[in-house]
Amino acid sequence: MSAAPVVDAEYMAEVERARRDLRALIASKSCAPIMLRLAWHDAGTYDKATKTGGPNGSIRFPQEYSHAANAGIKIAIDLLEPMKQKHPKITYADLYQLAGVVAVEVTGGPTIDYVPGRRDSSDSPEEGRLPDAKKGAAHLREVFYRMGLSDKDIVALSGGHTLGKARPERSGFDGAWTKDPLKFDNSYFIELLKENSEGLLKLPTDKALVEDPTFRRYVELYAKDEDAFFRDYAESHKKLSELGFTPPRSAFIYKSCQKPKSLLMQTAAGVAVAAAVVAWAYLCESNKRLG
């Protein structure tokens, strides 16, 4: 495990530059789905009992990206390598999670709170920690509970399937979960509740969300209330992206310093507008009297 990056103003500025570059890359390559998958698969190996795995950039090594569940993920790793060379200060772990956050946002999804400072690691976990699409509810709970996540997290994060499609050469399955696989919305849950979604994919793990009564409550909620889905998804995605990671205090200090500055600028602008309105009203009244 490498040393944690120093998250200072310079690092945060580099993160914002990388964020802009990621928006452009994802828009030009239409690669939001695989960027979200990369972020998920790097983080989703976490084991809270042993404190191993998690969002540490180890997925960039052959011993991990060659796992069966990661078939095709090298495409995203290769797309991001020039970005890493352009922004060398940022760790792979931070870059991969930032790519996932941006992928959701640029496709119409919620804004996800992102705090940098993750360490890079070359220690890859053993194969088999990611969900197996051919299994059901008990398996999903086993995998997500191992990470320290909840039933709500399971369903909310499954909503990420609103982006992208399964490919037979990668998973053995073929097709998209929604009619617009490049738009982040709640249509995944709407389609899940339909008895027949012609031409759309429903994996055994997807069907488990409807068959399990606890999971189904969240599916029904998210299908009828996209705002609720976006709120819960943003919360669950943040939890996933920070598994085993304690954000550095410096990042919070930086963010807190930015908010008052922004608020001050907004307040100053508001005062200036109000003063202009008062001055204009006074001028109009004076003109009336002179007339």
Curated annotation (Swiss-Prot):
Compositionally skewed regions (Basic and acidic residues) per UniProt: 116-133
Catalytic activities: L-ascorbate + H2O2 = L-dehydroascorbate + 2 H2O
UniProt cross-references to PROSITE patterns, sorted A to Z: PEROXIDASE_1, PEROXIDASE_2, PEROXIDASE_4
Pfam name, any one: peroxidase
Segments of this protein annotated with the region Disordered: 114-133
Keyword RNA-binding: no
Site entry (Transition state stabilizer), positions: 37
Top-level division of the source organism's lineage: Eukaryota
Cofactor(s) listed in the protein's UniProt record: heme b
One annotated Gene Ontology cellular component of this protein: chloroplast
Record EC number: 1.11.1.11
Catalytic-site annotation from UniProt: 41 (proton acceptor)
Tissue: Expressed in stems.
Binding-site residues, heme b: 161
Topological category with respect to the lipid bilayer: Single-pass membrane protein
Cofactor annotation remark: Binds 1 heme b (iron(II)-protoporphyrin IX) group.
Keywords: Calcium, Heme, Hydrogen peroxide, Iron, Membrane, Metal-binding, Oxidoreductase, Peroxidase, Peroxisome, Potassium, Transmembrane, Transmembrane helix
Subcellular location(s) of the protein: Peroxisome membrane
MF annotations from Gene Ontology: heme binding; L-ascorbate peroxidase activity; metal ion binding; peroxidase activity
GO biological process: cellular response to oxidative stress; hydrogen peroxide catabolic process; response to reactive oxygen species
Other observations noted: Binds one cation per subunit; probably K(+), but might also be Ca(2+).
Function noted in UniProt: Plays a key role in hydrogen peroxide removal.
Family: Belongs to the peroxidase family. Ascorbate peroxidase subfamily.
Listed PANTHER family: L-ASCORBATE PEROXIDASE 3, PEROXISOMAL-RELATED (PTHR31356:SF61), THYLAKOID LUMENAL 29 KDA PROTEIN, CHLOROPLASTIC-RELATED (PTHR31356)
Protein name: Probable L-ascorbate peroxidase 3, peroxisomal
Lineage: Eukaryota, Viridiplantae, Streptophyta, Embryophyta, Tracheophyta
Gene assigned in the entry: APX3
